[in-house]
Each structure stands twice: as C-alpha cells, then as structure tokens.
Amino acid sequence: MASPELSQFRRIVVKVGSALLVDSDKGEVRTSWLAALADDMAKLHKEGRDVLVVSSGSIALGRSRLKLPRGPLKLEESQAAAAVGQIALARIWSEVLGAHGIDAGQILVTLQDTEERRRYLNARSTIGKLLEWRAIPVINENDTVATTEIRYGDNDRLAARVATMASADLLVLLSDIDGLYDAPPKNNPNAKLIPVVDSISSEIEAVAGDAESELSRGGMRTKVEAAKIATTGGTHMLIASGKIEHPLQAIANGGRCTWFLTPANPITSRKRWIAGTLEPKGTLTIDAGAVTALRAGASLLPAGVIKVEGQFARGDAVIVRGPDTSEIGRGLIAYDADDAERIKGRSSPDVMTILGISGRAEMIHRDDLVVGG
C-alpha cells in the first residue's frame, strides 16, 4: 500500500520526546533544533492546518535546572522536578512559536483525562477553542501529579489518546529512529525499514524493540501500542526521525518513516470506537423529526428529545432511540441526566434561561454521535 503524503492531512499532532528536546550531555534544550521544528510547524499553520504538540521534557528540564545527579529519580523527586520543568517548558514553546506570531497554549493532562468522559469533553473543548483561535496547543503530561505514567512512561500512548480526542487525522511521533524495522537496526546491519503498516499484527508487535535512554522513557513497543490506539480511533500515525533539523519538512519531502494506517475513514473509525467501547449509562428517546435530522448528519438538539432515562453524567455514552423504541444510534451526552431532563423538548435559546448558564446547544454533537442504519 502506498504511503500517504503530509499535505493530505488537516489536523496534525506532533509528539516530541525528552531525548530530542533536551541535550543529554548539557541538560539544556536543543534550541537550534527546536527552532527548526517550529519553522516546520509555522509553515503548516500558515497553510491553514491545525497543529498540536504533545511535548515531553518537564522532568528532564527540571532535573537540569535543579542540578540533580544522573540516574533514576524517586517518584516524589520526579514530580518535584516536573514542577520546575513545566514552567521552563511552557516558556520555551511560547518563545519559539511566538517568533512566528503564533500563540502557544499549555494544557496539562494525564491518561485519566482522556478516559473519564467529562474530563475528556472539557479537554477537547479547550483544545478546540485554541485551534479556533489559531493558537497551537502544547500538551504535556502532568508529571507533578501523575504516578504510574511517571514510572513507566506513557507519553506515546498519551499522544495517541490526545490525537483521537482532538479528532486529528495524523499523529507524528518524532523519535531517535526513523521508523519500525523488521529487526533491531543497531544489532542487525541487514534490518529493513517497514514503510507502511496497514494492520498491527502479532508479527508487527513482535519486532517492536525497547530503544530506551535515561531521558526518554518510551521505546518502540510503546509506539506500536500508541499506533493501535491512534488507528482504532481514526488517526493515521507515523514514526520518523527527529534527530535531523526540519523533521516535518523531511517527511513532506518523502523522507524515511513508518506509516501506520487506519483501517477505514478516520471519522467512521473514530465513531466505531465510541460506539464499541463505551458502556451506555442512559437512553434518550427522540421524535421522528429528530430521527430524520440525525440520519442526515445533524447533531441532536434538546428540542427533539421526548424522553430521558438513566443516571448519567456529562460525557457518558447513551443510547438514542426513535419514537418506536428502535435504536437509532449511540453517542456522548453533553449534559448530565438532571439537566437533560430539564431541557428536553426545549429550543436552544431556552437552554440558557432554564439552566442559568450558557450551555452547549447540542444534546449530542454530531462528532460524538454514531447513527445506525
């Protein structure tokens, strides 16, 4: 299967690891390399694309600023180092993007923020607004409070979850290696790059090694796990070398990398993920007009809802049924059960009056809705 081209993608997440961002010998940011990467991002941004960054580096920068000795850190030491490093990391990204007239917006998350649905929706809304304002969200794991993530390193998988949460169509993992090989290239001079992976088979998983360093906690295995998450959620992913300057430009020019392709259209695949992995917590019954609107691709508005059942929170999955009780689809609800009951059957302008807040007009946004046949 032919490799896609970078120009095909509208919303791109770029993951930058600590080993690329921080010079391990000096303990300082690789400023020339980062400026070149920012140039690449600015070019994509100028072309009208949405660009997001998932950046590691807070612990590495913190331990450098605090002049901590080399070697493993205890959990509380990692968290304290991250507290210092996060400030430095935010300033660095603000400066390199600001040089191109682009605002950077910092978002700190953990894996829980992408798994607990209310927090998922809040984070996604924030990302969406930053992109609407043409800022570049810079997302980092909140290492000051994370526990398991610090010990085992999950920023590759975090990046994949962020990419699906943001409905990105491409995730770029910049690494110290230019892709996935059929054997460890450091040990086998005959190892061959695998340019395209259209299905993550057991054979693909078997060739994923563990290329680790003191600064970068993830290896190829976590990148393949990230590819599973990304492609299942509708996001293509690629692994490319970040050791060169202008790595995104190199990809655009056809440089060496490994593509992991989604099995279907990204939107379709993401919606299959929503429908297939979440346990419904309630049911909405809608009128015939709303059924027609949903099947035409519209969002579900409160006016079309005639019955609310179950105890659910904002962001939970619910079943949507027609007036004859047949299942129309499933989706992520934008209100909790009590508020949904209060605004059912009401027009969108009434929502603010009833709830006393400027709520979202949709009961379920079409991007969060899977409509059946």
From Swiss-Prot:
<keyword id="KW-0547">Nucleotide-binding</keyword>
<comment type="pathway">
    <text>Amino-acid biosynthesis; L-proline biosynthesis; L-glutamate 5-semialdehyde from L-glutamate: step 1/2.</text>
</comment>
<dbReference type="InterPro" id="IPR015947">
    <property type="entry name" value="PUA-like_sf"/>
</dbReference>
<dbReference type="InterPro" id="IPR005715">
    <property type="entry name" value="Glu_5kinase/COase_Synthase"/>
</dbReference>
<dbReference type="GO" id="GO:0005524">
    <property type="term" value="F:ATP binding"/>
</dbReference>
<dbReference type="Pfam" id="PF00696">
    <property type="entry name" value="AA_kinase"/>
</dbReference>
<dbReference type="GO" id="GO:0055129">
    <property type="term" value="P:L-proline biosynthetic process"/>
</dbReference>
<comment type="similarity">
    <text>Belongs to the glutamate 5-kinase family.</text>
</comment>
<dbReference type="InterPro" id="IPR019797">
    <property type="entry name" value="Glutamate_5-kinase_CS"/>
</dbReference>
<keyword id="KW-0808">Transferase</keyword>
<keyword id="KW-0067">ATP-binding</keyword>
<dbReference type="InterPro" id="IPR011529">
    <property type="entry name" value="Glu_5kinase"/>
</dbReference>
<keyword id="KW-0028">Amino-acid biosynthesis</keyword>
<feature type="binding site">
    <location>
        <begin position="175"/>
        <end position="176"/>
    </location>
    <ligand>
        <name>ATP</name>
    </ligand>
</feature>
<dbReference type="Pfam" id="PF01472">
    <property type="entry name" value="PUA"/>
</dbReference>
<feature type="binding site">
    <location>
        <position position="143"/>
    </location>
    <ligand>
        <name>substrate</name>
    </ligand>
</feature>
<feature type="binding site">
    <location>
        <position position="155"/>
    </location>
    <ligand>
        <name>substrate</name>
    </ligand>
</feature>
<dbReference type="GO" id="GO:0005829">
    <property type="term" value="C:cytosol"/>
</dbReference>
<protein>
    <recommendedName>
        <fullName>Glutamate 5-kinase</fullName>
        <ecNumber>2.7.2.11</ecNumber>
    </recommendedName>
</protein>
<dbReference type="InterPro" id="IPR001048">
    <property type="entry name" value="Asp/Glu/Uridylate_kinase"/>
</dbReference>
<dbReference type="InterPro" id="IPR036974">
    <property type="entry name" value="PUA_sf"/>
</dbReference>
<feature type="domain" description="PUA">
    <location>
        <begin position="281"/>
        <end position="358"/>
    </location>
</feature>
<dbReference type="GO" id="GO:0006561">
    <property type="term" value="P:proline biosynthetic process"/>
</dbReference>
<dbReference type="GO" id="GO:0003723">
    <property type="term" value="F:RNA binding"/>
</dbReference>
<comment type="function">
    <text>Catalyzes the transfer of a phosphate group to glutamate to form L-glutamate 5-phosphate.</text>
</comment>
<keyword id="KW-0418">Kinase</keyword>
<feature type="binding site">
    <location>
        <position position="15"/>
    </location>
    <ligand>
        <name>ATP</name>
    </ligand>
</feature>
<dbReference type="InterPro" id="IPR036393">
    <property type="entry name" value="AceGlu_kinase-like_sf"/>
</dbReference>
<dbReference type="InterPro" id="IPR001057">
    <property type="entry name" value="Glu/AcGlu_kinase"/>
</dbReference>
<feature type="binding site">
    <location>
        <position position="56"/>
    </location>
    <ligand>
        <name>substrate</name>
    </ligand>
</feature>
<dbReference type="GO" id="GO:0004349">
    <property type="term" value="F:glutamate 5-kinase activity"/>
</dbReference>
<keyword id="KW-0963">Cytoplasm</keyword>
<keyword id="KW-0641">Proline biosynthesis</keyword>
<dbReference type="InterPro" id="IPR002478">
    <property type="entry name" value="PUA"/>
</dbReference>
<dbReference type="InterPro" id="IPR041739">
    <property type="entry name" value="G5K_ProB"/>
</dbReference>
